[in-house]
Amino acid sequence: MSSVLTQPLAFHPPRPAVQPREHGRWSVDEIEALFNLPFPELMHRAQTVHRENFDPTRVEFATLLSVKTGGCAEDCGYCPQAARYDTGVEASKLMEPAEVLAAAQRAQAAGATRFCMGAAWRSPKDRDIEKVAELVRTVKALGLETCATLGMLEDGHAQTLQSAGLDYYNHNLDSAPDFYGDIITTRDYQDRLDTLARVRSAGVKVCCGGIVGMGETRRQRAGLVAELANLTPYPESVPINNLVKVEGTPLANQADLDPFEFVRTIAVARITMPTARVRLSAGRQQMGDGVQALCFLAGANSIFYGDKLLTTGNPDTEADVTLLQRLGMSRSAPDVR
């Protein structure tokens, strides 16, 4: 009886589905190919890009305060602040500067380097912008980076905020264009792009991302990333939100997104927008420590911290600090990019 000597099988890694690029637009096909990579290959590529641009052990802490809550006229299917949905969120007026100052001081004492103020408006009026500009000056005087998310901006609004010291303006695209109409009908996609253009022209940095887990396909997630990566330039800050299902909203009963699909979205965002801050935003409370750790490995390097994000829950500060300690990671210094 003859014996056959067998040699160990050699491992041949798959050829990259998309070659590294320095310039040029990303197609949805190219980005979908990234999503389709074997998970270890995708994570390796994302971590490699991350290390080329950031210290992979550092995470930015940002705080988000709702300075004007509820009563919004829009119909965003995920949002508990829409007046048309019965979600238990009570409308409130714009906070006074002293209240915002106290909140910013608490955030700074807890380690935040960026302070974002959110107001539930479809589009603020001129008088609203002047009041928010006062809030920006108040927070900026503490030495914190400032960010605001106020809805659609008209001509001149971004310039007023920039003059007050605003560093970043957040205005998310939310989804790919071909899924957008399924979740929002009161504002079209071009409205969002127009606001981003006004922000850029005023010299304010852009914070722009989206929400996943709303029922979109993987290709539509690729479409969202393509829209973000092809902005000129792409956003300095990219918040990726995992849908938080709120009773009373149309998406309250949406099926959960596979956690690995969320991690893939983070990794693809990192590869396609190498120097952006990729932020874990809404939905962290439902992820657990393991998924968050994978997201950091995939290139996320910023979180919103504090026990509430606008109107929904978020891990408490101590839990975030403990998680970073367990991972041998730490908070980053203010962004000087």
Curated annotation (Swiss-Prot):
Pathway given in the UniProt record: Cofactor biosynthesis; biotin biosynthesis; biotin from 7,8-diaminononanoate: step 2/2
Binding site residues for [4Fe-4S] cluster: C72, C76, C79
Catalytic activity entry: (4R,5S)-dethiobiotin + (sulfur carrier)-SH + 2 reduced [2Fe-2S]-[ferredoxin] + 2 S-adenosyl-L-methionine = (sulfur carrier)-H + biotin + 2 5'-deoxyadenosine + 2 L-methionine + 2 oxidized [2Fe-2S]-[ferredoxin]
Region (Disordered): 1-23
CDD domains membership: Radical_SAM
Any one Gene Ontology molecular-function term assigned to this protein's record: biotin synthase activity
One Gene Ontology term from the biological process aspect of the record: biotin biosynthetic process
Cofactor detail note: Binds 1 [4Fe-4S] cluster. The cluster is coordinated with 3 cysteines and an exchangeable S-adenosyl-L-methionine.
Membrane-spanning parts: none
Residue sites binding [2Fe-2S] cluster per the record: C116, C147, C207, R279
NCBIfam families: bioB (TIGR00433)
Family: Belongs to the radical SAM superfamily. Biotin synthase family.
Protein name: Biotin synthase 1
Taxonomic source organism: Polaromonas sp. (strain JS666 / ATCC BAA-500)
Gene name tied to this protein: bioB1
